[in-house]
């Protein structure tokens, strides 16, 4: 329909369209992007606020394959958007959000969009915010493991990086371990020593275990994702995270405090979509205590009272 309107409308004609259809907008963008002016109306209580969206921003989005084939245009017709890392995150968080709203007599006006990983979150958030859409973002805790990605996400929400850089560096420095990599020269020297000193043609179990111990790596980041913020070292790192987390929450970035989605319900093993289905099948009653932790988190994200 949008294509038909755009192709038949003459240069000296105008058309005023009231719509909740993303397909009409997409059709118009396909054939006459320069002629479109989108007026978005948001209602809060008894008041309407009106904003005219920037044509240049629409052109940028439409010329970007990543954004063009996402459901960003659907966001125009929702009160707010939640950006998550994966489709399974979206499914579980939306189920909980709908339930919380239903319990207090409200309807959900939130669209959940999965970004296909942390590395795409900043770009999608920036695009949505440029269209005057209310955006919140839910990354896993290990987003802190990559400064470039984390900085991009923070700055896409207009966070002054310098205001949180010190706290971020304190956290990162406390989580990097000397055992995250294996020193090849040290390993070679140790193996050579064991082989040269051994009088037997075969290595003993003790010698094998010594070599295995040297090969073993330890990552505090992995522990952080499995166990959440409780795995942060006590003291400076914990205080720094609390300060930084508050800054992020104030602008709409809610880091998963337990590490990742699956850590909210540890009674069920697995990962991804299968895990979500298994949880909902095993615990069909959303008022079950097993959901208390995730409901508390989503209530904070949505500013709802439990």
Regions found by a protein language model. Give the residues of each.
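Switch/communication elements of ASCE P-loop NTPase nucleotide-binding domains
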Residues: 1-71, 285-288, 292-293, 299-306
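Acidic, Mg2+-coordinating catalytic modules of nucleic-acid enzymes
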Residues: 69-83, 87-306
